[in-house]
Amino acid sequence: MLRDLFVKKKKYAAIPSEQVRKDVPDGVMTKCPKCKKIMYTKELLKNLKVCVNCGYHHPMNAWERLDSILDEGSFREYDKEMVSVNPLQFPNYEEKLENDRKKTELNEAVVTGEGTIDEMLVVVAVMDSRFRMGSMGSVVGEKIARAVEKAYELQVPFIIFTASGGARMQEGILSLMQMAKTSVALKKYSNAGGLFISVMTHPTTGGVSASFASLGDYNLAEPGALIGFAGRRVIEQTVREKLPEDFQTAEFLLEHGQLDAVVHRNEMRESLRKILEVHQGEGMAVWQN
């Protein structure tokens, strides 16, 4: 009928068949969790895993992080063979550790070593949240403490990139002890004139944020990083108040004086280079044996 000509027609979208979907290999495309844009993974990797549309910083693994800041081929790893055991006989802990080792090809949640940034020697530690959510157990604490001691021995700056859910519950009090161990190592290093740069990435929470992550001479963070001790819900229930939407973000902490700078990932290497250049040789005269 004539009136049918003026009826708004329904719009339809073609849904790709399973066969079409299978034609795109896994890993070729990546969807941004913030803006939902789908992009080529190689394009994302080229931009240091920062979304080209909205600037969201996707998580980096330890090796990607090291490659992004150190001179090519300069990294030498420390304590690679150190692995966690199960001192408290926590159920299924060994199995979970083994699964993470296979999945990440790491022995623990932190990689430590030395390398150069524009030919300036540094000791560096990078946490990897893929391994037990970057949680700090006995081995993580020991590796970080040893790295700090190595920086003290070499009289060079120490840089750490944190990404952690906090202390590792499967190791109980032994895990909590690492907060004190790492902090004491850094205090000794600081008293001797050492330069410590802490870079907090998403997420840095719990016992890690409450210990070594916040002790830097320079405390930096990546945009949008979640940084805090207790979870948002726990705090709201405790204080019985609604918290700001941007609470515990890097930008919130910067605004309230708890960070020195929020640094875009594409500018991180250059920012570190400038800090090192400013302090190069300066602290050596005050080192105490």
UniProtKB/Swiss-Prot annotation:
Binds 1 zinc ion per subunit. A zinc finger (C4-type) spans 32-54. Pathway: Lipid metabolism; malonyl-CoA biosynthesis; malonyl-CoA from acetyl-CoA: step 1/1. Residues 28-289 form the CoA carboxyltransferase N-terminal domain. Keywords: ATP-binding, Cytoplasm, Fatty acid biosynthesis, Fatty acid metabolism, Lipid biosynthesis, Lipid metabolism, Metal-binding, Nucleotide-binding, Transferase, Zinc, Zinc-finger. One of its GO terms (molecular function) is zinc ion binding. Coiled coil: none annotated. HAMAP family: AcetylCoA_CT_beta. This is Acetyl-coenzyme A carboxylase carboxyl transferase subunit beta. It comes from Bacillus cytotoxicus (strain DSM 22905 / CIP 110041 / 391-98 / NVH 391-98). The gene is accD.
